[in-house]
């Protein structure tokens, strides 16, 4: 049986994922400036490189400090990414937002995995990761549909403002 502390991690991961919609919106944002079509892949590359570079040091740090503190730092970085992307006035500033998004991913994704592993009994670890990923995927779908609706019916800026606000609510819940 999966204990209450596991379900708290699942809930935290689900709420965090609701605050972080698909990276496709990074491509849309950087492409909104009528710049070269190469900016879209550049945004994903930037996010991925920063994510990859940050993941290992964040993992080392997670082994030494409270995971909740590292998740909180990751949420602060995502709020900053949303702010930069909301205020972006050029592909360069949108690219900076994508870099911050990657840093957020590096600070949070491995930590969440470690928290799942640490709260699930060994005999149920595969099932625990399956449930965690199922709910995270469902929340990412919901978040992305909502972000798309905001993008289309309100504005691209509103998408990132609401994303940042949801991150703030998640951060308050974490503290």
Q: PLM features: what roles do these ranges have?
A:
Residues 24-40:
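Short amphipathic helix-loop junctions that connect adjacent transmembrane helices
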Residues 48-56, 137-141:
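Residue-level signature of mid-helix packing/kink "hotspots" within the transmembrane helices
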Residues 107-120:
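Intracellular juxtamembrane helix-capping segments at the cytosolic ends
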């Amino acid at each position: 049986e999966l204990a209450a502390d596991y379900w708290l991690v699942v809930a935290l991961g689900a709420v965090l994922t609701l605050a972080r919609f698909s990276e496709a919106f990074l491509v849309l944002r950087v492409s909104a400036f009528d710049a070269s079509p190469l900016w879209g892949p550049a945004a994903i590359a930037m996010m991925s490189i920063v994510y990859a570079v940050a993941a290992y040091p964040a993992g080392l740090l997670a082994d030494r400090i409270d995971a909740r503190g590292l998740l909180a730092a990751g949420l602060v970085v995502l709020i900053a990414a949303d702010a930069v992307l909301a205020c972006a006035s050029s592909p360069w500033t949108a690219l900076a937002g994508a870099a911050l998004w990657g840093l957020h991913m590096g600070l949070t994704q491995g930590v969440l995995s470690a928290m799942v592993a640490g709260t699930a009994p060994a005999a149920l670890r595969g099932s625990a990761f399956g449930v965690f990923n199922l709910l995270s995927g469902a929340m990412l779908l919901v978040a992305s549909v909502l972000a798309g609706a905001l993008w289309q019916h309100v504005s691209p800026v509103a998408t990132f403002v609401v994303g940042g606000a949801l991150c703030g609510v998640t951060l308050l819940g974490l503290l």
